[in-house]
Each structure stands twice: as structure tokens, then as C-alpha cells.
């Protein structure tokens, strides 16, 4: 399965919407997208995972590294997730204690 990403700017928030699978086979694409977002100067970044069907441990590790890089730049990171399977995985791994999770982009950009 492929991974696609689309970036939008909503006020001072950059929203990166993903669809497909975040797994070992799509890590290079995920890494490229996140690296580009790190290079640019953002106040807040939202990763919209609503279109994601699979999220594995290597992809989770990449997201954690991305969160650490953004924290060093004083950029906040948020995740949008409504898929029961993906959200449950994020909570089981305690990612929600590191990166805030919301159910919609508008909840974050208010």
C-alpha cells in the first residue's frame, strides 16, 4: 500500500493529512514529509491520521523522533485520529501522553 500526504496551512497551523499505511514500507516517504515540515518554521503542526489504515511500531518511533525535534524548536505537535483501531494503538503505547490527540483539526485550530 502507498502512503500519500497533503499539507495545508490553516492560520498559523500546518496540517499534514495522511492516507494509506504508516508502516515499514512507507517509512522513507513518512520521513521525507516530516523532515520537510521540520525544516520549515511552524508554530504548530497537526498530523491528521484519519486516512491511515495501518500504523506499526517503526512508524510510531519515527513520530516520536519528530515530536522531539519539534519540541526542541518550540513547535507544538498534535495528532488527529478518529479510527478506533489507530487511536486505541496510540493510547496503548502511551503516545497520547507525549503528543496531544484530538478528534478533528478544528478542535486544535480554534
Predicted segments, located by residue:
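STAS-typified acidic loop motif
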Residues: 3-32, 49-51
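Amphipathic alpha-helical interaction surfaces in cytosolic regulatory modules
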Residues: 24-98
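Short acidic-hydrophobic, aromatic-tinged amphipathic segments that line or gate anion-handling sites
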Residues: 99-104
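Short alpha-helical segment
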Residues: 107-108
Amino acid at each position: 500500500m502507498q502512503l500519500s500526504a497533503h499539507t495545508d496551512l490553516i492560520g498559523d497551523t500546518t496540517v499534514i493529512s495522511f492516507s494509506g499505511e504508516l508502516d515499514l514500507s512507507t517509512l522513507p516517504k513518512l520521513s521525507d514529509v516530516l523532515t520537510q515540515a521540520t525544516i520549515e518554521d511552524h508554530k504548530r503542526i497537526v498530523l491528521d491520521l484519519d486516512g491511515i489504515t495501518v500504523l506499526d511500531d517503526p512508524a510510531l518511533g519515527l513520530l516520536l523522533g519528530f515530536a522531539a525535534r519539534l519540541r526542541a524548536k518550540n513547535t507544538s505537535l498534535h495528532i488527529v485520529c478518529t479510527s478506533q483501531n489507530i487511536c486505541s494503538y496510540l493510547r496503548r503505547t502511551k503516545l497520547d501522553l507525549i503528543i496531544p490527540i484530538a478528534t478533528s483539526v478544528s478542535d486544535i485550530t480554534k
